[in-house]
């Protein structure tokens, strides 16, 4: 609630806190294999504005692993028709009620009737020049709902993540906050911390860290900030963040040697 600067919906926060444990149990039942400690307990890490280690993970590909498990389970359900490569272009609305969708399937336009329509299209990161979102996240789900007459709220709440790998002619790649949670530090060209004055420093709320980094870059007339991994033992870094390290190495970067 504090990290939300007083803007959090209290009921939503309470719902998350109360129901998170049983949701995790359900994911485990579905086959989600979170990382574990040597004693078999669930391994947790620290992220921004958290006072305790509570974030479950699967190395540095938690989201990918979660989607794989849920997709596999969904496709096992009888009576489910799964359509890939089909784009929804319009919601079908009659008498103020959504009763289906119009889809583009190759060169064909098709209407599909449904008793219920759920839009789960992700965000709109690709409305911005720089984003780590997948290419499909262009805000189309929100636009579809708005065009059909749905009430839209809280569009101003766009999260700007502080750390990403930004190189010429390459998509932005997210550098997980968990890297800082495991001991990495943000540094400027002289090795000083641009977030030292923030409560929580490298793990202050994301909006505060993002603003501090932007302010530092403007003052120093630079377009990037470094991330010093020296606080993470090499073996631990290789085990926890193989995807991030592999992506960096594809571009001849080794964050374990040079911020």
Regions found by a protein language model. Give the residues of each.
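Extended, hydrophobic alpha-helical segments in both membrane/secreted and soluble proteins
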Residues: 117, 137-144
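An anion/pyrophosphate-binding glycine-rich loop and adjacent beta-alpha core
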Residues: 144, 150-259
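Glycine-rich beta-alpha-beta "Rossmann" dinucleotide-binding loop(s) and their flanking helix/strand
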Residues: 130-140, 253-256
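Glycine-rich active-site loop/strand segments that organize a redox cofactor
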Residues: 1-16
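Flavin (primarily FAD) binding-site architecture
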Residues: 119-133
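Hydrophobic or amphipathic alpha-helical targeting/insertion segments
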Residues: 20-23, 32, 141, 147-148
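Conserved redox-cofactor binding core of oxidoreductases
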Residues: 28-109, 113-116, 120, 164-167
């Amino acid at each position: 609630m504090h990290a939300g600067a007083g803007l959090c919906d209290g009921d939503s926060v309470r719902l998350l806190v109360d129901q998170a444990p049983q949701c995790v149990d359900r994911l485990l039942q579905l086959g989600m294999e979170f990382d574990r400690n040597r004693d078999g307990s669930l391994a947790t890490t620290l992220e921004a504005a958290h006072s305790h280690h509570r974030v479950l993970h699967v190395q540095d590909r938690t989201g990918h692993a979660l989607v794989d498990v849920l997709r596999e389970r969904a496709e096992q359900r009888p009576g489910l028709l799964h359509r890939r490569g089909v784009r929804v272009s319009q919601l079908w609305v009659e008498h103020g009620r959504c009763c289906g969708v119009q889809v583009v399937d190759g060169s064909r336009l098709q209407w599909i009737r449904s008793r219920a329509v759920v839009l789960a299209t992700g965000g709109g990161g690709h409305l911005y020049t720089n984003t780590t979102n997948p290419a499909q996240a262009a805000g189309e789900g929100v636009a579809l709902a708005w065009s059909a007459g749905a009430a839209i709220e809280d569009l101003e709440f766009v999260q700007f993540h502080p750390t990403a790998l930004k190189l010429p002619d390459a998509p932005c790649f997210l550098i997980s906050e968990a890297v800082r949670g495991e001991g990495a530090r943000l540094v400027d060209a002289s090795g000083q911390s641009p977030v030292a004055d923030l409560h929580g420093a490298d793990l202050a709320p994301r909006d505060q860290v993002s603003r501090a980094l932007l302010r530092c870059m403007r003052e120093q007339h630079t377009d990037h900030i470094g991330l010093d991994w020296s606080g993470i033992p090499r073996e631990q870094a290789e085990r926890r963040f193989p995807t991030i390290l592999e992506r960096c190495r594809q571009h001849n970067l080794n964050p374990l040697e040079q911020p």
